Amino acid sequence: MLYIIRHGKTDWNVEHRLQGQTDTELNEEGRRMAREAATEYANIHFDVCYCSPLLRARETAKILLDGRDIPIIYDDRLKEMGFGEFEGLKECFSIPDCPVNVFFKDPANYTDPQGGAESMDSLFSRTGDFLEEIEPELEAGKDILIVGHGAMNSSIICRIKYNLDRKRFWDEGIPNCRLMRLM
């Protein structure tokens, strides 16, 4: 089976800042959320955990799997989508002409990333490569956990559940520290 979870809360989540690949840590609420998730999901079997190398995901994985003999493998392809010069921007949704708003409001039409932001094609390519690589493990019956991020997780969900239909990209966003079984 394949499971996916989003990291715990950070100060930037609370402040509504665009995190992207900026390496922020969990805040105390995020650590509490991860501890609660560890208790809630303690009886779910995982053979291996693949995790974004960004600190907020690493912290979540370590807390979530503390005391369990589950290897954590960090993979750059699981980093959050990059938002370039817009990372750190507060309340970007309230800025009408902010170019990354298209990604959040109408992802099917996010075709011209600006300011060094990552394209959806790039995001889908790297997460697709990752999924192809772990496919033999899934076929062998391994239970795999992915610890990631909002947009990165959505790219995997969109590929598996919606055949890359970009109109459905945000249909099943995962709240912080909530687990979803994908297959």
Regions found by a protein language model. Name each.
Residues 10, 152-153:
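Short active-site segment of divalent metal-dependent hydrolases/proteases
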Residues 42-45, 134-142:
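Glycine-rich phosphate-binding loop signature in dinucleotide/nucleotide-binding domains
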Residues 51-52, 125, 147-148:
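Short beta-strand scaffold positions
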Residues 63, 155-159:
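Active-site signature of alpha/beta-hydrolase-fold catalytic machinery across serine-
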Residues 67-126:
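Phosphate-handling substructures
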